Structures are given as C-alpha cells and as structure tokens.
Amino acid sequence: MASKYQSVQPGGSLIIAWRAQGKKVLIVGGGVVAAGRILHVLNADAHVIVVSPKAGLCKEVAWRIQEKQVEWRDRGFLVEDLSDDVNMVLTAIDDPSLSSEIYKLCKSKKIPVNAADIPPECDFYFGSEIRNGPLQIMVSTNGKGPKLASLIRKKIESSINPATGMALEKTGLLRQKLRDIVPEPENSRKRMRWMIEICELWSLEELAMLDENLINRLLGYFPKKTPSYREITTPAYSKIDNYIWFGAIIISGAVLLKHVSKAR
C-alpha cells in the first residue's frame, strides 16, 4: 500500500540558507577557484580572511585585496590560522595533502570545512547559484557533476521573470510595514493570510511597481479586503459599502447616463 507521505530519498544534502553576516571565513588559496569562493562569502556579508602568498594570487583576488574587501595574510597556511573565532574554512589549493591536513585540523576543532575538488573532505558543497536581488536558488549535484549543475542552473535562470528580484524587495517592504502597523502576536495569522492573498492576486510586475505611496494605500485595506493592483492605482474611484473601488463603475455609469438622457 502506497504511503500518503513523501518517500525518503537518502544520499542528499541538507540545503539551507546559512546566515554568515559578520562571521569569519578563512580561505586558503588565492587562485581562480578561491576567487569564486571569496565572491560567494562576500555576497553573504561574511568577514573573509585570505591566506596565500602574493605569488599565488590571481588578478581578481589581488584586486579584492587592493580594494580592502578581504583581510590578507601574505604567506602559506599555519595552524594558528584556525583560531577560535573562525566559523568556516575553505581550501582552494593544488596540494591535496595540505588540504587533507587542514580538513583534519578543522574536524578536531569542529569547524565546518570545504576542500575544493575533494568531495569526501567536505562538510558542505558549493552549488551553481542563481542570484536576482533577494532571490537565491542553488543547484547542487552533491559533487556528482558540477558542469551539469551549471547547465541546469542556466536553464532555470532563463525561465525566471526579470521582475522577480524587485518584486521580492517591494514585498519585503510591504511585509515589514504591515508588521510595524500591527505588531501584536495575535495578529500574525491575519498578517500572514493577507500577505498570501496579495502575493497570489498581484503579478510579479505589479509587486515590483510598489512604491511608498502605493504601499501606504494598500495597507489601508488591511485586514478587511485584499485589493487588486488596478483598484489602488486607477485615479477615479467611488465608495461603495465602505470599500473604495477604483474605476470599477466607469463603464456602467456611462451607460446609465445615456439611458437617463434618452428618458428625458
């Protein structure tokens, strides 16, 4: 008998969005692979420490050092680099034995570590990522096929509405303002239900066009009504049964006037 619950698919990774703001991430290496890792963690607002002699720096890493985007230690790896305040370690070097040594040291200190190109010595993987404003989508093959992950990511990315990133930004502003207006915990269900209805009713393009004026106008309907974009943006409006309907009776009103004129 088939279960009504979803089947377990073992062998996957736990894909989470880890908040790394201000956390110290140690990156051993300064080549092209390290450059990609550095960008990933800088995008997460982490404090990046690069350990690599100057001769091992690629142009991008050298530029980020020059721009003071990262902290740089101009030398090879030392055990002292694994201080107690390091939250994550990434190795991106062409020395498998040193990578393995760093991996073992990190495990002994319970520091999450990723050793590039050595899947068995990775606590986590870097997937192929899509970024559109607040939207982040990661495609991971769990180390099986990085190139395929990249191809799949491109297919997904091509299908994403260009307005998505801005729509998410504006939805976040609307959600925060609603929380500021009605912060009480007992209103959480009403807030959630109203926001769900807005997201289902409005298109991404409409959400992306929200500005402060429209947000304030929209919040005036909470919690009694979920208006459409057209209702709050059409200049002409009438009050019916204590609700504001924008432009909804213009056509019918014109027809009514025509009939009145004929009657006269």
UniProtKB/Swiss-Prot annotation:
Question: InterPro entries under this entry?
Answer: Met8-like, Met8_C, NAD(P)-bd_dom_sf, Sirohaem_synthase_central, Sirohaem_synthase_N
Question: Where are the active-site residues found?
Answer: D117 (proton acceptor)
One GO location term (cellular component): nucleus
Offer one example of a GO biological process linked to this entry.
sulfate assimilation
Q: What are the cysteine partners in each disulfide bond? A: none
Q: Which pathway does this polypeptide act in?
A: Porphyrin-containing compound metabolism; siroheme biosynthesis; siroheme from sirohydrochlorin: step 1/1; Porphyrin-containing compound metabolism; siroheme biosynthesis; sirohydrochlorin from precorrin-2: step 1/1
**What are the subcellular locations of this protein?**
Cytoplasm; Nucleus
Q: What are the alphabetically sorted keywords of the record? A: Cytoplasm, Lyase, Multifunctional enzyme, NAD, Nucleus, Oxidoreductase, Porphyrin biosynthesis
- Reactions that this protein is recorded to catalyse: precorrin-2 + NAD(+) = sirohydrochlorin + NADH + 2 H(+); siroheme + 2 H(+) = sirohydrochlorin + Fe(2+)
Pfam entry (one):
Sirohm_synth_C
Enzyme Commission number: 1.3.1.76, 4.99.1.4
Q: What does this protein do?
A: Catalyzes the conversion of precorrin-2 into siroheme. This reaction consist of the NAD-dependent oxidation of precorrin-2 into sirohydrochlorin and its subsequent ferrochelation into siroheme.
NCBIfam families attached here?
cysG_Nterm
- What name does this protein carry? Siroheme biosynthesis protein met8
Source organism: Schizosaccharomyces pombe (strain 972 / ATCC 24843)
Q: What is the lineage of its organism?
A: Eukaryota, Fungi, Dikarya, Ascomycota, Taphrinomycotina
Give the gene symbol: met8
